[in-house]
């Protein structure tokens, strides 16, 4: 049962003004029409607090009487929770349950919710141990919790089902103050990750000498928590490596290892493992890691990788690629715009993305600034030219594809270049007549336009003249009928 001070949510005091203010503050929450029971409890607490404020000696006497009248089992339970050596020991809790079993069923029924209330108030409680008592007393099955807040009780029982975030027995070798600090820190961190994910980054950034218990369950949770907010922790890399050693086929182990290496700032040494993971386990998570690495270390590949990821997602039920032109989705264009305005691209990479945003006709690809580049030795030039033609739904020259394919088969291609080249070779289907087709020149095209425009203009004039004659003839006939 809650005391009057707990209901009013203030500390014990003899100042009547503080009691009255607390009562008025709680009154709107317990209106007599909407919550008559809550209002009754609040009113009784207010009157009791006023009485104790007038006679504080009576409160001390009441506390002594309550302590003396408290059931033996309740006192034993408080002793267990305060014990530095037994509070986290399942065997000690089993011993307490055996002591509880010596009482008759009527007494146990009366003790069910008082024991639950004491457990809820405990600051440093092992939920794994509390689950033993919850199972014995059927806290999950009964709803007749006398005098307890229902929401508070449900939240506590839900926490018991989730269990401790790590094995508290791993703390027994440390001083009691460090035990309490560690339990409190990880309990708050887990609640923050579960109910307030927007504040996890700020929580993890808090400075302090935090102990990391030797518990594999906690270590994997830390991997998940840190990776979810894209934060690196060097101490977690060996944890992920050990996980992968124990479970070589685990997709999660490989993901968290790549993620932590990336967020800890690893560069080229990570790329081979990251590409292997991306190819072995296609997923949105793998796509995001690859794009993040490219954005940090090789931004000129970023736009090409976005096309690769979009193309890979466009497959039929049998896993065969669809006839789909990359660059049409809103997400792709948003990512292109993001890297374009990041200031990280080379002039060649910037001109490539700009050409994609302003698509030309397939025959006029020479107008693109990518096509006019003179950096023949650039490893990106062939990639950009072929990729642009894929977006424009045109046929690239075979010699460009041949150079890319030679680099790929010879093992000279950068890992990201290899990924992009394979996508382009899949998307492009050359026709035999395309091999010897040269790029059109602007002069030739303009001449063709001039030659084609002349007969088209004469035909239009003839059509208009005939139309006027027909209309005039029809109007004349109509006029003759009415004359």
Swiss-Prot record:
InterPro entries, sorted: J_dom_sf
Record bears the keyword Chaperone: yes
Domain J: 3-70
Entry annotated with the keyword Cell membrane: no
SUPFAM superfamilies assigned: Chaperone J-domain (SSF46565)
GO biological process: one example: response to cadmium ion
Comp. bias intervals (Basic and acidic residues): 442-454
Alphabetized UniProt keyword annotations: Chaperone
Region (Disordered): 431-456
Record's GO cellular component terms: plasma membrane
Source taxon at top rank: Bacteria
UniProt GO MF annotations: ATPase activator activity
Biased composition (Acidic residues): 432-441
Protein name listed in UniProt: Uncharacterized J domain-containing protein DjlC
Organism: Escherichia coli (strain K12)
Lineage: Bacteria, Pseudomonadati, Pseudomonadota, Gammaproteobacteria, Enterobacterales
Name of the gene: djlC
């Amino acid at each position: 049962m809650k005391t009057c001070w707990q209901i009013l949510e203030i500390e014990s005091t003899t100042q009547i003004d503080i009691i009255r203010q607390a009562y008025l503050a709680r009154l709107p929450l317990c209106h007599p029409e909407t919550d008559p029971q809550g209002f009754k409890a609040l009113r009784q607490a207010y009157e009791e607090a006023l009485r104790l404020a007038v006679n504080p000696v009576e409160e001390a006497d009441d506390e002594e009487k309550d302590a003396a009248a408290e059931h033996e089992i309740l006192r034993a339970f408080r002793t267990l929770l305060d014990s530095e050596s037994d509070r986290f020991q399942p065997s000690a809790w089993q011993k307490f349950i055996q002591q509880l079993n010596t009482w008759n069923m009527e007494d146990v029924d009366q003790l069910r919710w008082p024991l639950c209330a004491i457990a809820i108030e405990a600051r440093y409680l092992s939920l794994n141990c509390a689950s033993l008592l919850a199972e014995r007393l059927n806290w999950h099955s009964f709803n007749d919790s006398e005098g307890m807040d229902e929401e508070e009780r449900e939240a506590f029982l839900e926490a018991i089902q989730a269990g401790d975030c790590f094995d508290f027995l791993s703390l027994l070798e440390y001083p009691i103050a460090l035990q309490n600090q560690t339990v409190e820190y990880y309990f708050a961190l887990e609640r923050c990750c579960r109910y307030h994910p927007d504040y996890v980054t700020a929580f993890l950034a808090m400075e302090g000498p935090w102990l990391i218990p030797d518990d594999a369950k906690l270590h994997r949770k830390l991997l998940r928590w840190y990776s979810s907010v894209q934060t690196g922790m060097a101490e977690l890399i060996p944890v992920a490596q050990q996980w992968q050693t124990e479970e070589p086929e685990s997709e999660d182990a490989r993901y968290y290892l790549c993620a932590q290496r990336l967020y800890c700032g690893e560069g080229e040494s990570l790329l081979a493992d990251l590409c292997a993971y991306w190819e072995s386990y296609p997923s949105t998570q793998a796509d995001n890691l690859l794009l993040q690495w490219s954005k940090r270390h090789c931004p000129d590949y970023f736009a090409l990788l976005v096309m690769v990821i979009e193309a890979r997602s466009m497959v039929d039920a049998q896993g065969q690629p669809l006839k789909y032109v990359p660059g049409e989705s809103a997400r792709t264009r948003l990512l292109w715009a993001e890297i374009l305005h990041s200031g990280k691209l080379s002039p060649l990479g910037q001109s490539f993305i700009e050409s994609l945003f302003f698509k030309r006709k397939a025959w006029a690809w020479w107008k693109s600034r990518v096509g006019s580049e003179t950096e023949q030795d650039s490893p990106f030039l062939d990639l950009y030219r072929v990729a642009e033609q894929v977006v424009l739904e045109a046929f690239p020259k075979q010699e460009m594809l041949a150079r890319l394919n030679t680099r790929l088969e010879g093992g000279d291609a950068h890992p990201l270049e290899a990924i992009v080249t394979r996508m382009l070779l899949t998307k492009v289907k050359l026709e035999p007549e395309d091999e010897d087709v040269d790029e059109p020149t602007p002069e030739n095209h303009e001449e063709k336009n001039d030659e084609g425009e002349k007969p088209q203009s004469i035909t239009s004039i003839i059509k208009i003249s005939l139309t006027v004659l027909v209309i005039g003839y029809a109007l004349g006939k109509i006029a003759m009928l009415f004359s």
